[in-house]
Swiss-Prot record:
The lineage of its organism: Eukaryota, Metazoa, Chordata, Craniata, Vertebrata. Belongs to the BPI/LBP/Plunc superfamily. BPI/LBP family. InterPro entries: Bactericidal_perm-incr_a/b_dom, BPI_fold-BPI/LBP, Lipid-bd_serum_glycop_C, Lipid-bd_serum_glycop_N. This is BPI fold-containing family B member 3. It comes from Mus musculus. Glycans are attached at residue 139. One of its GO terms (cellular component) is cytoplasm. GO terms for molecular function: lipid binding. May have the capacity to recognize and bind specific classes of odorants. May act as a carrier molecule, transporting odorants across the mucus layer to access receptor sites. May serve as a primary defense mechanism by recognizing and removing potentially harmful odorants or pathogenic microorganisms from the mucosa or clearing excess odorant from mucus to enable new odorant stimuli to be received. It is found in: Secreted.
Length: 473
């Protein structure tokens, strides 16, 4: 079966993407042309777009050439018209529209040329011609401009739709040559006009997907992230680039403005046939900053929270630093109060993600039926390794303790070398603190919806001050 062509020129942008620099703190999305083509193809397969075309002229006696059409109501071929001998031909209607095959080409600085290859089958009947079947090839050329919706989302607007009907074949039935020529001429004027709504419907589906890119994503008890478009889309010969600005808000609705990196992110080149999302350091810092502000990083550790092989008594502490206990008796339970009063620092570089959390540790002795006795206070830094795992909607973070360094801030009995406690404290933190911290991090780093691209199986690349997710269509 020969294929026709829909050609759709999307005037998406008049500039090309910058040379790998993300000047803002935004999320940079690069949509490969294959993803755009797949979105359009899926809109034709899964939706009612093609069925709506079939429903345009399907009534038996109200078809294109039926009553009220070209043969009825004073139509060109109606009784008394030029060719009254076919006055009883009726019900010519679209029975089948071949699923278009989508191909497109990105034109840097111009737009996108989209080709939809299809063929239309029409059926009809009449006493002189019997059962009639026609096949028509179609070439619809449309121009679409990029505008902004009232919500501030990118939207494609159909500006002009011109059509060219290709070869028409008589598959079955009989039509005298003069009549066939007139039918062909009439179809050239009428039939392609019925197919312009296909272009409009495709644009509507794509616009819905583009609109979903800019959305409000909840961050659990921390707040939310609103994705907005920072600039108009840019276009290269392989991808469309969206500079998306993430606006983080607290649970009360206040905009959170944490420090941003001064040096632009150098985004690596995108490989062909892949789509890419760059998640900036700003989002990581903001999530950890919200955790600190909400007190989620603070924890009081009691003996019940650690396994038996992790000691948390004055006896065990005396073996490490006896001078820290003074005159306290052995075998008393210890309490550790961890407080984080400053925002953690997230470091993304050299394919590694680390988080440094400044912490104050108050060590107390639990007195039965009494007020805990403060022993000493430590100032420390927890250095954590971050493991990043993408899903379809977010970038998940899980932390593990690499090291804990402490120094004595104040001591009631007498000063001592606090470094002797680091291994013991590290065991306590791993047993009680890390699980609680990772539970709070289940909110993850939200990802914008990019034409339904699934980043669950994406390749994660940690670069300077950003994380790049790359996925093949």
């Amino acid at each position: 079966m020969m294929l026709g062509v829909y050609t759709l020129l999307l005037l998406w942008g008049l500039a090309t993407p910058c040379l790998g620099l993300l000047e803002t703190v935004g999320t940079l999305a690069r949509i490969d042309k294959d993803e755009l083509g797949k979105a359009i193809q899926n809109s034709l397969v899964g939706g009612p777009i093609l069925q709506n075309v079939l429903g345009t002229v399907t009534s038996v006696n109200q078809g294109l050439l039926g009553a009220g059409g070209l043969l009825g109501g004073g139509g060109l071929l109606s009784y008394g018209g030029i060719f009254s001998l076919v006055e009883e031909l009726s019900g010519l209607k679209i029975e089948e529209l071949t699923l278009p095959k989508v191909s497109l080409k990105l034109l840097p600085g111009v737009g996108v040329q989209l080709n939809l290859h299809t063929k239309v089958s029409l059926h009809g009947s009449g006493p002189l011609v019997g059962l009639l079947q026609l096949a028509a090839e179609v070439n619809v050329s449309s121009k679409v401009a990029l505008g902004m919706s009232p919500r501030g989302t990118p939207i494609l607007v159909l500006k002009r739709c011109s059509t060219l009907l290709g070869h028409i074949s008589l598959m079955s039935g009989l039509l005298p040559t003069p009549i066939f020529g007139l039918v062909e001429q009439t179809l050239c004027k009428v039939l392609p006009g019925l197919l312009c709504p296909v272009v409009d419907s495709v644009l509507s589906v794509v616009n819905e997907l583009l609109g979903a890119t800019l959305s409000l994503v909840p961050l659990g008890p921390l707040g939310s992230v609103e994705f907005t478009l920072a600039t108009l889309p840019l276009i290269s010969n392989q991808y469309i680039e969206l500079d998306i600005n993430p606006i983080v808000k607290s649970i009360a609705g206040d905009v959170i403005d944490f420090p941003k990196p001064r040096i632009p992110v150098k985004v690596p080149p995108k490989e062909d046939h892949t789509s890419q999302v760059t998640v900036p350091l700003y989002l990581f810092s903001t999530v950890f900053g919200l955790l600190q502000t909400n007190g989620a990083l603070d924890l009081d550790i009691t003996p019940e929270m650690v396994p038996r092989n992790v000691p948390l008594t004055t006896t065990d502490l005396a073996a490490l630093a006896p001078e820290a206990l003074g005159k306290l008796p052995p075998a008393q339970h210890l309490l550790l109060s961890l407080r984080v009063t400053k925002s953690p620092m997230v470091l993304l570089q050299n394919k590694k993600a680390t988080v440094s959390i400044p912490v104050t540790i108050h060590v107390l002795s639990s007195v039965p039926q009494g007020t805990p006795v403060a022993l000493f206070q430590l100032n420390g830094v927890m250095t954590l390794n971050a493991h990043l795992a993408p899903s379809s909607t977010k970038l998940h973070i899980s932390l593990s303790l690499e090291r804990l360094s402490v120094q004595l801030a104040s001591s009631f009995p007498q000063p001592f070398d606090a470094s002797r406690l680091e291994e013991w404290l590290s065991d306590v933190v791993r047993a009680a603190y890390m699980q609680r911290l990772n539970e709070h991090l289940e909110v993850g780093i939200p990802l914008p919806k990019i034409l339904n691209v699934n980043f669950a199986n994406s390749v994660v690349d940690i670069i300077e001050n950003a994380v790049v997710l790359t996925v093949a269509p």
